[in-house]
Amino acid sequence: MVEADRPGKLFIGGLNLETDEKALEAEFGKYGRIVEVLLMKDRETNKSRGFAFVTFESPANAKAAARDMNGKSLDGKAIKVAQATKPAFESSRRGPPPPRSRGRPRFLRGTRGGGGGPRRSPSRGGPDDDGGYAGDFDLRPSRAPMPMKRGPPPPPRRAGPPPKRAAPSGPARSSGGGMRGRALAVRGRDGYSGPPRREPPPPRRDPYLGPRDEGYSSRDGYSSRDYREPRGFAPSPREYTHREYGHSSVRDDCPLRGYGDRDGYGCRDRDYGDHPSRGSYREPFESYGDLRGGAPGRGTPPSYGGGGRYEEYRGCSPDAYSGGRDSYSSSYGRSDRYSRGRDRVGRPDRGLSLSMERGCPPQRDSYSRSGCRVPRGGGRLGGRMERGGGRSRY
């Protein structure tokens, strides 16, 4: 690295800033002829930077001058005199600037790296460029698993409305159950059609027409109302199951009207109570409630079977209540129910009414005989009958 500059060139450092080329030439001219005096100055201020280069014509003169003048005082300052070296000089001259230039890049890097590093790390923390958006979406998926959870629930929710469209696969199940529920709803209406039409109270019809006609998707929103509605038009099983299982809400809804009027219902309650599968009544009832209650996602697969069983209890409940528990199991067997459910899914409009007409005329008879539905028919059942007409529009 340390290469001597051309022979006879001396480096003079530590100069007084006031010392100029003339003073240097006068001082060093004693040792020989000087070819060049180069005082390094600041470009901007044009002031001396404190060092200079003096080139002697004879290298021997340069050596003598360096030997004598090194460490001597010039203009009040001790000066350093040495053989100029290219790298030493240029590194000393440019070297400090290059360090500075390097320092500046480092500084800039520091700003870029420091500032940019923080920026990057925040960006990593935040959008993370792509990772951050991925992170962002990961967060959203974590939220969005709420969205995505929400997302999947919408398919189940859609599973509610798809009953109209005979939704595919899993939804189709709940759609089967849902169509069944709808068919039962209509069937229940037709089954009670005789009594209900006598006293259809518009207030009931209007509120229920809203949720019902808005679609089974309203099943999501109207879970509580739909929950009651099955009680309304199929109160027999629901009231029964609720009586058996102590759901006071239904007892409050229909006890005096439905059971108070009929001692026979008490007997039939005992009849059903004796039935060994009381728990199964409750389970299908609950699963059916889930299906209708807007948790199709939860209850879809069970709700199909549950719905079927519940429908059996429900659609045939009049027979069962009339004492035809066996006839309920035989004539309204699950296979019959399921085939009806399929018909309903295939033919949501006609299938409902036809299967109702075919499947549950006994309901109408038994209910007209028992009469316990008449008061409720005047209430919710009437509204549902009217809605039955409205639903067939779908």
Curated annotation (Swiss-Prot):
A molecular function (GO) held by this record is:
RNA binding
Q: Does the keyword RNA-binding apply?
A: yes
- Tell whether Transferase is among the UniProt keywords: no
Q: Which residues form the RRM domain?
A: 8-86
Q: Name one GO cellular component term.
A: nucleus
Query: Which portions of the chain have biased composition (kind: Pro residues)?
Result: 150-165
Q: Which InterPro entries match?
A: Nucleotide-bd_a/b_plait_sf, RBD_domain_sf, RBM, RBM1CTR, RRM_dom
Keywords, comma-separated and alphabetical = Nucleus, Ribonucleoprotein, RNA-binding
Region Disordered, annotated ranges: 67-394
Question: What's the domain of life for this entry?
Answer: Eukaryota
Q: CDD domains this protein is in?
A: RRM_RBMX_like (cd12382)
Give start-end positions of Low complexity composition bias. 321-333
- Residue ranges with Basic and acidic residues bias: 67-78, 196-231, 239-285, 334-350, 383-394
**Compartments, as annotated in UniProt:** Nucleus
Using the UniProt record, give the first listed, main subcellular location.
nucleus
Q: Which PANTHER family match?
A: TRANSFORMER-2 SEX-DETERMINING PROTEIN-RELATED
State the name under which the record lists this protein.
RNA-binding motif protein, X-linked-like-2
Organism this protein belongs to: Macaca fascicularis (Crab-eating macaque)
Taxon lineage: Eukaryota, Metazoa, Chordata, Craniata, Vertebrata
GN (gene name):
RBMXL2
